[in-house]
Amino acid sequence: MALRFVDWDCYFEEPKSDVFVFDALYAPQYIEEGLLYPLGKTIPESSVYPAWTLEQASSQGIYYGIPQMVCMDTLFYRKEDPAVARVQTMQQLYEAIGPRKTQALLPGRDEGVIADFSLNNEMKYYNILQDHTGKVVPVQAMGNVQEDAMQYLKELYAMTGTATGRYDDGNEFTRAEWFAQGHGRALYAYPEAMSAIVRLGQGDDTDVKAISSCEHPDVATAYVDYVSISSRIPADKVEAAKKLTALLTSKPYMLAALKPASKEGVPQYLLAARQDVMQELAASDPNYQKLYRHLYRAKSWHVMAGTKDFAAWEAKVGPDIERDLKK
């Protein structure tokens, strides 16, 4: 049976392909709408996955997805900066760094946080709501935009600068490169930003941590990608689809995908959901060890989860968030 790969983005449309990878944020919606094929009461090698990665993978005892990758907001900072090293919340970060001193695209070494808003402002606001309410799914707060929660998104933009925050050249590593080249006091991005930092020779001088998005303790939510099968799959393709799903989440496949192609190569520094894969990556590379210890194992994580009508809520609050940011 021949494989055909199709570009698809779960943030813009619902799944149509036989086997697909998607953000578990939409798992409740996909399961509710009957879009996912039931995988059964067990999944291959379930013991290698931390329990939290499976939080949204099943419903009523039936699995609909297998975890593949995890990702979380990450604060990168220089070892020479003890004030930032002590930070545990976004409020403390703002108190330590404050708003930008200049509005140039590239901040000086002694100012600002270079923040990556590559998902969207709605997602960052949702993350703030989680920490602000202390709930993984803050249903009661998911109405109109709350000014007290918005204040933290405004402070993050103040530390970043509007031009820097809105900048988009299509290169996901541009901000990490700026930080590695000496701009900004900190970088607020995703774990894979470590790849550009190491490539530019700054890995040994850079530390990482996860912090709360507001003044309250971190609820610690992480993005998890699940591999699933479409409920529309023809009956004669089900077994082949199950084999592909198992392959895409297997240890050999994950290690082959995440390790550099050569000894001289720089790892991608993406985080696997499987603990056995992360342990091997951490043992093979000191900067993967940082990500494993200070991110993957550092907190009692929860899967970033939404409601069954999450996409509709995003569309509703998006324009209001943009208006508030311009005030």
Positions of the model-derived regions?
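Extracytoplasmic/periplasmic solute-binding protein
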Residues: 64-68, 73, 91-142, 184
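C-terminal capping/gating helix-and-loop segments adjacent to ligand/active sites or protein-protein/ligand interfaces
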Residues: 221, 255-327
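Glycine-centered hinge/linker elements that transmit conformational signals in sensory
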Residues: 134-171
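Hinge/lid segment of periplasmic solute-binding proteins
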Residues: 22-74, 85, 209-211
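A ligand-binding cleft/hinge motif common to bilobed small-molecule-binding domains
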Residues: 25-31, 188-205
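Short helices/loops that flank or line small-molecule/ion binding pockets
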Residues: 7-20, 28, 33, 81-82, ...
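Conserved N-terminal structural module of periplasmic/extracytoplasmic solute-binding proteins
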Residues: 1-26, 236, 255-256, 319-327
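Extracytoplasmic/periplasmic substrate-recognition and gating elements
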Residues: 200-264
